[in-house]
Structure formats: structure tokens, C-alpha cells
Amino acid sequence: MKWLKRLWWIGLLVGMAVSMLVWAAWEPDRQLGQLLARWAPEPSSFLELDGMQVHMRDTGPRDDPTPIVLLHGMASSLHSYEGWQTSLQDQRRIISVDLPGFGLTGPSPQGDYRIDAYTRFVLRLLDTLGVKRVVLVGNALGGEIAWQTAVLAPERVRKLVLIDSDGYPPAVLSMPAAFQVASMRGMRWVSERILPRAMVAISLRSVFGNDEKVTAEKVDRYFELNLRVGNRRALFQRMDQAQFGASSALIRRVQQPTLVMWGERDEMISPDHGSLFCQDIPHCQLVTFAGLGHLPQEEDAERTLRALRDFLAK
């Protein structure tokens, strides 16, 4: 009987230790109003669409016949393109948006985070803004949304830019710590309520090529925006609904001139996938960036912009 008593005490101590760890990592949701002052200054605006208040930035000349639309990746936000938008908006109309489930837009009322739901969202956004044809840019998840939109509605996409894009299986080399937690179904009740800032910092360092580029402000942004009400649950739903690489056969149907950009130190999706895109897309140019990771447009806006400007000028 002594061993049963000892086992009971061990279980109690382990339970107490786990409870203390959960308590230490517990983070309440942030209400939208708590986040606006810091993360939605001008030129941010909100557009009512599909039952959501969609956070977006629409800058530059309104007579631009082919605006540039920027789509971010999973657990990110339009802020990932701030450097690009600021630099390009004097000459081009630039539209960046927080996709459903992320950033200040928050969760989809339907809870549908499949790629086809996102492509329909992008097309409805363009319709609402009265935009007929665009240069469509996407990073990671945003890249797959971009190329699938180009396949679904080729008349709406003049040119395509894919940055470390999802598309091929196996899609993921390594997964940031925050995504690993999100993929653990048995931990959902707990993980919807915890988000250690340290985990966010570790996750960001794993997707940047240079750790020194991961500033305290960037960690704050990813940390606070992922605490927006509903975003943690939306991330878990997206992970459940994701079918990485399931539609890769469709990539051959992309006919638009395409620029593929890839960070050579991307540890999340293999840089080899950049070559795969250009094997399957007939009018394709691949540019890689030494020293950059999974978010090259955010990590070094100036260097990646040079490649983008050259592509747009052709």
C-alpha cells in the first residue's frame, strides 16, 4: 500500500507543478479596443466584410490601374509588410489586410479557414473596393492564398509574387514552438488560454535568419495581436483544417508572370520549394536571399524591395 500512497503524492506534486506552469503562462484575451492605439494608427482603417471588421491599409494613388495587394502568413498581420507599403505607396496603390483569424480582423464568424474560404474572401475584398485587377503578393499561407486566387480567377491577377510560399508537400521543415502547441489537440483548452511571451520570441527567432532583427517591438506585436479575442482559437482551427500540399497539382495552372522570393535560411519551408514553383509555373523568376529566413520581406524590406521593383518594371 505504501507504493500507492507514494504514487498518489507524486501525482499530486506533478499536478501542482503543471498547474503552476499554466498559471505562470496564463494570458487573458485582449479586447480589440486595447490594441487599436498601438497597432492601428493611421493609415489603418476597418472595412465591414463577411460579418467582420477587416483591418486594412489602403494607401497610394487611387488611379493606379493595378494595385498591389499584400497577404501575410499564419499568425502574422499586415504589419509584416510595413516597410514595403511605406516605400511603394508614393507611386503605387498598396492594399494590405489582416486576414480572417489573424491580426486585428480577428476570427471568421463561420470558423472556416480553408484556402478556398480565403480565396473567396480576397475576391470579395476586391469587389468591395471596386478593384478589378491586381498584383497579388503573398507570404507563406498568404502565398498559397495568392496562387490559388490566381488559378481561380485569373482575370483578376495581373502578376503574382510568392514569398516563401506554402504549396508543396511536405510543406513544413520545422514548426515554430507556438505552432507546435497549436497542433496539440489534447491541450486545446489550456493552450487557448496561455501564450508565454518567451514562446513568441523563440518562435520569431526560428523564422528569422538573423536573431538580431527580432526586436522587442516585433515580439510585442506578434504577442499582443495573437492575444486578440478569438485569434488563438482561430489558429487552432486553421491548423485542424490545413491540408498542406494537397492542391499542389493546381500550381501548374498558374499562367501569370510570377516572382518567387525565398530566404535561404528559411527553416520552416525548404528553399528547394522555390525551384519547384518555377518548374511548374511557365513565366517564373526565382530570387533567393542569403541570410534571410521565412519572412524576408519583414526581415529586410530594402533588399527584397529591389527584386520586387525590378519585377514590376518588366
Report each predicted region and the residues it spans.
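Conserved alpha/beta-hydrolase catalytic His-Asp/Glu region
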Residues: 28, 34-35, 174-175, 193-253
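Alpha/beta-hydrolase fold catalytic core
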Residues: 1-66, 91-92, 132, 313-314
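Short beta-strand/loop motif that positions the catalytic acidic residue
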Residues: 254, 260-262
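Flexible "cap/lid" loop of the alpha/beta hydrolase fold
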Residues: 151, 160-188
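Catalytic active-site module of serine/aspartate enzymes centered on a nucleophile-bearing elbow/loop
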Residues: 284-314
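Acidic catalytic loop of the alpha/beta-hydrolase fold
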Residues: 265-269
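Conserved HGGG/HGGXW glycine-rich cap/lid loop of the alpha/beta-hydrolase fold
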Residues: 59-104
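Active-site loop/oxyanion-hole signature of alpha/beta-hydrolase fold enzymes
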Residues: 49-50, 57-59, 99-141
